[in-house]
């Protein structure tokens, strides 16, 4: 794994967030003393944090609004872990029991499908859920999760969210949410890991990405999102019952449907065709003109529009 180093300013921002997560109010002078920086420099760093977090400064007192501070939420029925800095929330979750949540402000080694780098800017929401499911139910997660995420964004924020196969959530052609699904067998059940990255109040570095802040023109308290996701994941088996209905809604939201694409196959070249459908378990159906192929997200490294 390539070593990733933090710049000094990001380190101090994370230290400040750690202090604010543990206290209702922190004085600028106290932060300067604890971090060993001049007060003026601390004030500048806090001012920068205000661009990505719901942080207020009044009379030299710094507060992080509880609705945006992940340390202030305790989802019922979950083992909840908040750590400002981690290698990967997925890796932390692997050492925890099922029905655990891991939230972080920054991941040094966040990753998506096939190990691709997952950029975790400050101000976003980087979260992993670990729970236990029967395999026959778990197979419908790749279709259910994008639908659940799209519906949430549409209903709560009025965002025209759509799905880019297999499970990216896009707005105006730019990525707003990414999802990774992993699992491991334990006896007759699966331990499922759902990693979700939401560009909330961060400023994405990639032009093909977008944040809620950029779309709405305002900051969004992240704990509302954590609370909703926690509630849904706690009842996930109920959501997966009507997988036929989920598949139909997935296809309605699928921006990839009907497009001509190039599918980069792991170790086997490129397949060009038109996306004609998706199965109940999330496999894509490509019409090459001579045949229809069913391909899974584990087989396709990347899907490019033509």
PLM feature segments, named:
Residues 2-154, 220:
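N-terminal lobe of the biotin/lipoate ligase/transferase fold
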Residues 17, 259-306:
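Conserved RNA-binding domains used in RNP assembly and mRNA/RNA metabolism
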Residues 81-83, 162, 296:
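General small-molecule cofactor/ligand-binding pocket signal
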Residues 99, 105, 166, 176-178, ...:
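Conserved beta-strand residues within beta-sheet cores
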Residues 105-107, 170, 182, 262-266, ...:
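A generic structural motif
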Residues 109, 200-203, 283:
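Short, acidic Gly/Pro/Ser/Thr-rich loop/turn segments
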Residues 120-222:
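Nucleotide and nucleotide-moiety/phosphate-recognizing core
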Residues 215-271, 276, 305-306:
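Conserved, helical-rich catalytic subdomain that frames metal- and/or nucleotide-binding sites
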